[in-house]
A protein has these predicted regions:
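Alpha/beta enzyme core
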Residues: 33, 38-40, 45-151
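N-terminal basic, low-complexity leaders that serve as flexible interaction/assembly modules and, when applicable
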Residues: 1-43
């Protein structure tokens, strides 16, 4: 194991071996593998901002498999997306890139002073898809932050 990866893992000594193995999996993948640096392709904007606003300028973006291929060709460390996008390609691309399931999402259909994302996926679903991690957005300081921490 490269020294930098071992150093990063030393910060997670209280975590279980599965979590640590997934960290190694992410940190050793892609063009920056082994450097301790990450480039994660996040594709939740279709949910967050709407598919037309997000993908109309590049129609290939409507296809969830496009993003898997983009992440691979770009040498990304991992690919993060909502449940539907990952379900579309997790089996086809199994083991080719670490996956991160975005477990909550928010839309911008109306302005909110204190947004509260909806839980849209579970840890069980992340495990079923072979994900290395989950992503969960929290808005610290909002009146809903306690609810988000509890989720």
């Amino acid at each position: 194991m490269k020294e930098r990866i071992a150093q990063i893992l030393s910060w997670y000594e209280s975590d279980n071996p599965g979590t640590r193995a997934n960290l190694v999996r992410i940190l050793n993948h892609g063009r920056l593998g082994g450097t301790g640096r990450l480039v994660i392709l996040p594709v939740d904007q279709g949910f967050e901002h709407g598919p037309a606003r997000s993908f109309a300028p590049n129609p290939a973006g409507y296809n969830p498999l496009y993003h898997f291929q983009l992440a691979l060709e770009a040498g990304c460390t991992a690919y993060a997306a909502p449940l539907g996008f990952l379900e579309a390609g997790a089996a086809r691309y199994a083991g080719e890139i670490p996956l991160i399931l975005k477990a909550n999402n928010h839309d911008v259909l109306h302005d909110e002073k204190d947004p509260l994302s909806a839980v849209t996926a579970t840890v069980r679903q992340a495990l079923r898809l072979g994900c290395a991690a989950i992503g969960f957005t929290i808005y610290p300081g909002s009146s809903e932050s306690r609810t988000m921490y509890e989720q």
